[in-house]
Swiss-Prot record:
Organism: Salmonella newport (strain SL254)
Main subcellular localisation: membrane
Job description of the protein: Part of a membrane-bound complex that couples electron transfer with translocation of ions across the membrane. Required to maintain the reduced state of SoxR.
Cofactor(s) needed for function: [4Fe-4S] cluster
Protein name: Ion-translocating oxidoreductase complex subunit C
Gene from which the chain derives: rsxC
Amino acids binding [4Fe-4S] cluster 1: 377, 380, 383, 426
Topological relation to the membrane, as annotated: Peripheral membrane protein
Cofactor note: Binds 2 [4Fe-4S] clusters per subunit.
Length: 735
């Protein structure tokens, strides 16, 4: 009795709520063996054919590749993809892929060479000799992913299971109508599938291994039983046909009686599930050393003349496979990738086959029926009765339409497996699955944005905390510096005190101050006399240089004289004196030219180096500038405007001045000037002083005519130059 009870418990199966029984339509394609499809001339391999990020490219345009050669590198959840055949990489560019919107994803495009040459394959026939980590890494690097539809990387899934997995379930239910890829694979490759299951069991070391298969696959069941006849480590469980019994949570409940909690995974209750196609791919990767480059695809529907299951290379265009099956499209022909309940319609047929492509359905118009108009929900609760996840689809529908994301999340919309059972039974023809997919996408986008905002806030708070710490440390340093002087400051203070003490010690004789005594300045006087003697000696050593330096430019002297005259006139006006006689710019120019000629002649007579001859044209220009400056000073001082100069007379006078200057230069160059006698110069200076004194006396007796500041400035300039030259000549004569 105990044995019978144990046997009953061993083969016991459970049921799940909900579910539907749609027409199976599997007999169209499961009756013919697997066959190969001729190679397509061009393959398009998307870099992302799984859940996770795409891998890093390791080929470039123009490279020749072999079948099984890695096109990308896989790190973490980045699963590598491999070349489906030998050929040449002609492009790496975005291409439309297997997606309801045919989104463009980065793909490697290969032109096949028709040789279909493999890379060097190295199989591990004795896989038990390798470690668990090595087997998982090999499975990952050979590109094995879940072939049941999810596309989750198998290596990552095995690594995450760890030691907490007690039950390994092999999903062979294949519950969706029309699809027979797993059924045909189990009929033709049952031994290889069982070998792959044993590799997975060796990695996970579970207590039990269960194979769940629906009872509508008698040939596959018989083949598996034949292979497992002598096996005691693997149990085959035949379950009733019911859609969607192939769901991960539903099959787990059927075989173990355990329910996966809301928001959880099968691994949370010690269960890990793999598809039969995945087990076959694991066997080829580990034992045969072949990366996943092909998979079984069901070609079915009334629009194809030769339905069946084929080995389709990854990257093969859908059009190529359908044409091989005798595709006869109608006017409004649709092609569905996947089954009629969970699949999606392809916008065009140039998309490639990927790892999750298990079926290509090309139905006729009568087979699918005419599209029906969506009506309002009548709250019949048929969708709730059919839901295998125990959800309330009608409530989720209202929340999705009303953008009530919080309520949709509270009603566990994330647990929806998008099986389509609710839409199948809906009498109002509401596409509930489409609403749920859109709502889940919006919720995921909101959560992603909230996560980014939280990360940004955390970074900001960390920065603020760091700034506060730095500020506190800076204030602490300032306080410590204010309380106690720095070491170098103390050293400087100590050095200064030492110097003061040393000076005090050196002062042995005290300073005595006597009242009424005069200071002894003899040393200071002697130093001053020495500096004077040194200056005289230096001046005598360089008489010519001093002469050259001290000698002023007569042209500059004339300009300075004109400016001096203007300043003197302005000062007279400010002092309130009578306005001087208006300045005649023509006379000023003539006087400036004569003054320059006299100065030049005196320089030549003194024996100094001849100055550069004055250009008459430059003299005329300078005279014009002097006239303009004088006129401007007159206007600023507010004096009466002078009589406007006649330009013709000014030109004549300038020409006469230039002729006189040129004549004086020629005379100075033809005969050398006599050296100036200092005694004569002294006599002339005395006579000049006497004349000046006499003029002053006359000015005191009777009022003189107001002096012309211009003439006074010119005379002063000439006197300064003459005195300077006489002094230089006297020094030369004394030497």
């Amino acid at each position: 009795m105990l044995k019978l009870f144990s046997a009953f418990r061993k083969d016991k199966i459970w049921d799940f709520d909900g579910g539907i029984h749609p027409p199976e339509m599997k007999s169209q394609s499961n009756g013919t063996p697997l066959r190969q499809v001729p190679l397509a001339p061009r393959f398009v391999i998307p870099l992302k054919q799984h859940i996770g990020a795409e891998g890093e490219l390791c080929v470039s345009v123009g490279d020749r590749v072999l079948r099984g050669q890695a096109l990308t590198r896989g790190r973490g959840r980045m699963l590598p993809v491999h070349a489906p055949t030998s050929g040449t990489v002609i492009a790496i560019a975005p291409h439309s892929t297997a997606h309801p919107s045919a989104l463009a994803e980065l793909s490697v495009i290969i032109d096949a060479d028709g040789e279909d040459r493999w890379i060097e394959r190295e199989g591990w026939s004795d896989y038990r000799a390798h470690s668990r980590e090595a087997l998982i890494e090999r499975i990952h690097q050979y590109g094995v992913a879940g072939l049941g539809g999810a596309g989750f990387p198998t290596g990552v899934k095995l690594q995450g299971g760890g030691d907490k997995i007690t039950t390994l379930i092999i999903n062979a239910a294949e519950c969706e109508p029309y699809i027979t890829a797993d059924d045909r694979l189990m009929q033709d490759c049952a031994a290889q599938i069982v070998e792959g299951i044993r590799i997975l069991a060796h990695i996970l070391q579970p207590r039990e291994v269960l194979i769940g298969i629906e009872d509508n696959k008698p040939q596959a069941i018989s083949m598996l039983r034949a292979v497992l006849a002598d096996a005691h480590d693997i149990s085959l469980r035949v379950i009733p046909t019911k859609y969607p019994s192939g769901g991960a949570k539903q099959l787990t409940q059927i075989l173990t009686g355990k329910q996966v909690p809301h928001g959880g995974r099968s691994s949370d209750i010690g269960v890990l599930m793999q598809n039969v196609g995945t087990a076959y791919a694991v066997k080829r990767a580990v034992i045969d050393g072949e990366p996943i480059t092909e998979r079984v695809v069901t070609l079915t529907g009334e629009a194809v003349s030769r339905p069946g299951n084929v080995w389709a290379r990854l990257g093969t265009p859908v059009r190529h496979l359908l044409n091989d099956a005798g595709f006869c499209p109608s006017a409004d022909q649709m092609v569905i990738m996947g089954g009629p309940l969970m699949g999606f319609t392809l916008p065009w047929l140039d998309v490639p086959v990927v790892k999750i492509t298990n079926c290509l359905l090309a139905p006729s118009v009568t087979e699918m029926g005419a599209p029906q108009e969506e009506k309002s929900c009548i709250r019949c609760s048929a969708c709730a009765d059919a839901c295998p996840a125990d959800l309330l689809p009608q409530q989720l529908y209202w929340f999705s339409k009303g953008q009530q994301h919080d309520k949709a999340t509270a009603h566990h919309i994330a647990d929806c497996i998008e099986c389509g059972a609710c839409a199948w039974v809906c009498p109002s023809n509401i596409p509930l699955v489409q609403y749920f997919r859109q709502e889940k996408a919006e919720i995921n986008a909101i959560r992603l944005e909230e996560k980014r905002a939280a990360e940004a806030k955390a970074r900001f708070e960390a920065r603020q905390a760091r700034l506060e710490r730095e500020k506190a440390a800076r204030l602490a340093r300032h306080k410590s510096a204010a309380v106690q002087p720095a070491a170098k400051d103390q050293d400087a203070i100590a050095a200064a005190l030492a110097r003061v003490k040393e000076k005090q010690a050196q002062a042995t004789q005290p300073v005595v101050i006597q009242a009424g005594s005069l200071p002894d300045n003899s040393a200071v006087i002697a130093a001053r006399e020495a500096r004077k003697a040194q200056a005289r000696a230096k001046q005598a050593a360089h008489p010519v240089a001093d002469s050259a330096i001290s000698g002023g430019d007569p042209r500059k002297a004339a300009v300075e004289a004109a400016i001096a005259r203007a300043k003197a006139r302005k000062q007279e006006q400010q002092a309130g004196s009578e306005p001087a006689e208006p300045v005649d710019p023509r006379k000023a120019a003539v006087e400036a030219a004569i003054a320059r000629a006299k100065v030049r002649k005196q320089e030549q007579q003194a024996g100094s180096e001849p100055a550069e001859p004055v250009d008459p044209r430059k003299a005329a220009v300078e005279a014009a500038i002097a006239r303009a400056k004088a006129r401007k000073h007159e206007q600023q001082a507010g004096s009466e405007p002078a009589e406007p100069a006649d330009p013709r007379k000014a030109a004549v006078e300038a020409a006469i001045a230039r002729a006189k200057a040129r004549k004086q230069e020629q005379q100075a160059g033809s005969e050398p000037a006599e050296p100036v006698d200092p005694r004569k110069a002294a006599v002339e200076a005395a006579i000049a002083r006497a004349k000046a004194r006499k003029q002053e006396q006359q000015a005191g007796s009777e009022p003189a005519e107001p002096a012309d500041p211009r003439k006074a400035a010119v005379a002063a300039a000439i006197a300064r130059v003459q005195a300077k030259k006489a002094a230089q000549q006297q020094v030369v004569n004394e030497d």
